[in-house]
Amino acid sequence: MNWRSEHIWVELLKGSRKRGNFFWACILFLGSLGFLSVGISSYLGKNIISILPSQEILFFPQGVVMSFYGIAGLFISSYLCCTILWNVGSDYDRFDRKEGIVCIFRWEFPGIKRRVFLRFLMRDIQSIRIQVKEGLYPRRILYMEIRGQGIIPLTRTDDQFFTPREIEQKAAELAYFLRVPIEVF
């Protein structure tokens, strides 16, 4: 979601609360519960869930492996659920031409640096950079080069949904708004 006026540009970006993450967390959770219940059923020698016949499965080695896969899947699905709950990667970029200030805010994993907040002057922005790598794993990333602070990514490195035309258009609009040149590398 973007909001623009004559002097302010605010761009809100989704973090880990995407439809795909919800889908994979649920699928992984249900699948790992199935594996774990089959492993436990093979240990007990009776069916816990009637849909999953596990009396024919020996506990050693198949039941142990199924239990291990179930526990590993529960850990991975709990990791996905935590990233969704904490909204890791959610952020906004605010460019204010009137005050000459750029603010970049990012949510990270809980800890000392959970909130990353960068604030700098617009006159310190040297250029908008586009990185384009084609091939099997294409990458199209938009960066902002800042004097004294290096290069800051403005788009996610995992967003592969930008076509070359979309990333060029976004870079051109932002460069025009900020009145800085565009570099492609």
UniProtKB/Swiss-Prot annotation:
It is a multi-pass membrane protein. InterPro entries: PSI_Ycf4_assembly (IPR003359). GO terms for cellular component: chloroplast thylakoid membrane; photosystem I. The chain crosses the membrane at residues 21-43, 68-90. It comes from the Eukaryota. GO terms for biological process: photosynthesis. The keyword Aminoacyl-tRNA synthetase does not apply. It is found in: Plastid, Chloroplast thylakoid membrane. Keywords: Chloroplast, Membrane, Photosynthesis, Plastid, Thylakoid, Transmembrane, Transmembrane helix. Pfam families: Ycf4. Belongs to the Ycf4 family. HAMAP family: Ycf4. Seems to be required for the assembly of the photosystem I complex. This is Photosystem I assembly protein Ycf4. The gene is ycf4.
